[in-house]
């Protein structure tokens, strides 16, 4: 089992072949030996490779303007929110590159709060940022979280989702992005601290404080509740960027009251009342979030506040057609695979946008509307090889009329034949 030099009967390094007399130290393993020189060489190789990986990962963080330009390819509108996010994300990863200290000045982490109506693009913005930076990304729902000791999800399970997104590479996960949705749903029900514990509100905010600020958290590998004698994954949250989003329904009334109070004399209330909801959201301050029900410590962990506008008909039509992965482009590609050209008339796009506004679902509801319109088309057309083009009209959207189908010779299929 031992490796001997046959001539002198000495032990030798299994890697370089030097004898124990030719090296300073020989470390024994199960049936093998390695000398101090080979150990030093291996250490240098490993450190060099790991160092190179680290440099490649965050050496070329896009500049804020570049980040916004890429966001423009996937997300329509919300220019002010994009600008705020681009600066915050750039500063965050610049801080990581500098190891959090520059000339003994410690750089604090700036997590982000996104405030905007349902379907305005909060989740999509966060997802796109993670894609731009090529970092792990996880989405969590704040409504499912409870503080320790109550039935529900522990806040550490948020971190488990990020670790899973990084294929259990903890070091990679420690530089990822977590988007916590519906954060407004864990607001305290009143401005005054409650004597009894608020399981779904203040308690969750308290539980989130540590991981938002930066701590070494113990995460159960299989999720669920912690229990004794269980192994944990240790993860440092110092460099994880947290983006918390919510609709914050009713906060515009709080902002309106604050603006009204600051105007002295006649017309004070009118000035605040005339402001549209989107304008009010753009004027949100930390004190408004405090009155809404977030605790001061929690607001302090989210120093960057970005507000999103409600999407109008024009913006929703643009969302349907302009982004790289726009829904209309996706459905066109689906029918193209069946050798059928798909066309949406302008009136059809406008009616789809109007339906989304009526349902108050914003951009989030666009896919379900189009899926409903396209169901019969996608069911029937794969079985037909005589159709060249399918045209979705305004009447198709509003009254459920069949789309116009054109044959390869240019003639239009009658509606009777289509429904047959």
From Swiss-Prot:
Induction per UniProt is:
By heat shock.
Q: Which superkingdom does the taxonomy of this entry point to?
A: Bacteria
Q: What is this protein called?
A: ATP-dependent Clp protease ATP-binding subunit ClpX
PANTHER family (alphabetical): ATP-DEPENDENT CLP PROTEASE ATP-BINDING SUBUNIT CLPX-LIKE, MITOCHONDRIAL, ATP-DEPENDENT CLP PROTEASE ATP-BINDING SUBUNIT CLPX-LIKE, MITOCHONDRIAL-RELATED
- Report the family membership: Belongs to the ClpX chaperone family.
Residues the record lists as binding Zn(2+): 13, 16, 35, 38
GO BP annotations listed: cell division; protein catabolic process; proteolysis involved in protein catabolic process
Cellular compartments per GO CC: HslUV protease complex
- Organism this protein belongs to: Bacillus subtilis (strain 168)
Question: What keywords does the record list, in alphabetical order?
Answer: ATP-binding, Chaperone, Metal-binding, Nucleotide-binding, Stress response, Zinc
Q: Which residues bind ATP?
A: 117-124
């Amino acid at each position: 089992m031992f490796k001997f030099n046959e001539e002198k009967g000495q032990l030798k390094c299994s890697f370089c072949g030097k004898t124990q007399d030719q090296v300073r130290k020989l470390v024994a393993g199960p049936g093998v030996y390695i000398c101090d020189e080979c150990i030093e060489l291996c250490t240098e190789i490993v450190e060099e490779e790991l160092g190179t990986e680290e440099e490649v990962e965050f050496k070329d963080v896009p500049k804020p303007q570049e980040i916004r330009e890429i966001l423009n390819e996937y997300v329509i509108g919300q220019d002010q929110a994009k600008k705020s996010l681009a600066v915050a994300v750039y500063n965050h990863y610049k801080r990581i590159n500098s190891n959090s200290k520059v000339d003994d000045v410690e750089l604090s982490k700036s997590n982000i709060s996104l405030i905007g109506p349902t379907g305005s693009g909060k989740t999509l913005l966060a997802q796109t940022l993670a894609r731009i930076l090529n970092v792990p990304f996880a989405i969590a729902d704040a409504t499912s979280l409870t503080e320790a000791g109550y039935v529900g999800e522990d806040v550490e399970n948020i971190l488990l989702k990020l670790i899973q997104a990084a294929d259990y590479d903890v070091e990679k996960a420690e530089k990822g992005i977590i988007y916590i949705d519906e954060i407004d749903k864990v607001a305290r029900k009143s401005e005054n601290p409650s004597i009894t514990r608020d399981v779904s509100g203040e308690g969750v905010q308290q539980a989130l404080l540590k991981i938002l600020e930066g701590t070494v958290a113990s995460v159960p590998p299989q999720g669920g509740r912690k229990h004794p004698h269980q192994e944990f994954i240790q993860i440092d949250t110092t460099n994880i960027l947290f983006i918390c989003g919510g609709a914050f329904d009713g906060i515009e009334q709080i902002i309106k009251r604050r603006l009204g109070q600051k105007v002295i004399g006649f017309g004070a209330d009118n000035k605040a009342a005339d402001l549209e909801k989107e304008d009010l959201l753009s004027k949100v301050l930390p004190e408004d979030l405090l009155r809404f029900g977030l605790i001061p410590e929690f607001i302090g962990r989210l120093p960057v506040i970005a507000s999103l506008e409600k999407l109008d008909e024009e913006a929703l039509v643009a969302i349907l057609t302009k982004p790289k992965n726009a829904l209309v482009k996706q459905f066109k590609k689906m029918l193209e695979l069946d050798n059928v050209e798909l066309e949406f008339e302008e009136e059809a796009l406008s009616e789809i946008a109007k339906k989304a506004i009526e349902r108050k679902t914003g951009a989030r509801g666009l896919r379900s509307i189009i899926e409903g319109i396209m169901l019969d088309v996608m069911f029937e057309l794969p079985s037909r090889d005589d159709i060249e083009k399918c045209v979705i009209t305004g009447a198709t959207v509003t009254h459920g009329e069949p789309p116009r189908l054109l044959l390869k010779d240019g003639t239009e299929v009658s509606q009777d034949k289509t429904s047959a």
